Amino acid sequence: MSSSSGDCIFCNKKNCKVISSTKYFFIIRDTAYPVTKHHTLIITNRHVDDFFDLTKDEMSDLDEVLKEQKKQLKKLDEEISAFNVGVNIGKDAGQSIMHCHIHLIPRRKGDVEDPRGGVRGVIPDKQKYKRK
């Protein structure tokens, strides 16, 4: 779905301190529910619910935005040693704001005891596994 919603906090940029923008996206730091320091949200300018509905031009721009934000974040904080990139698509996957946004989560050595499994942790029983 891609119709604008009058009460969408991202369409209204409610409580959004925009740090950068492109033709297709605006970028903010997640200050409401950050997973780590400098957790970044890359949000579509147009109202579109589903990541899979992004256009080729939007996907191409997103690639550049992610690379640029990675570079900026590493300049901002030299302790950043890795990243998680995540998208929740649909309520059953945890999407709570029905406006497409991508999480860029900076990671630091030792920020969790055992980072193996990374995004597999969305289903806790699947995070730990042994390679075959």
Indicate where each model-derived feature is located.
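HIT superfamily nucleotide-processing domains
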Residues: M1-K132
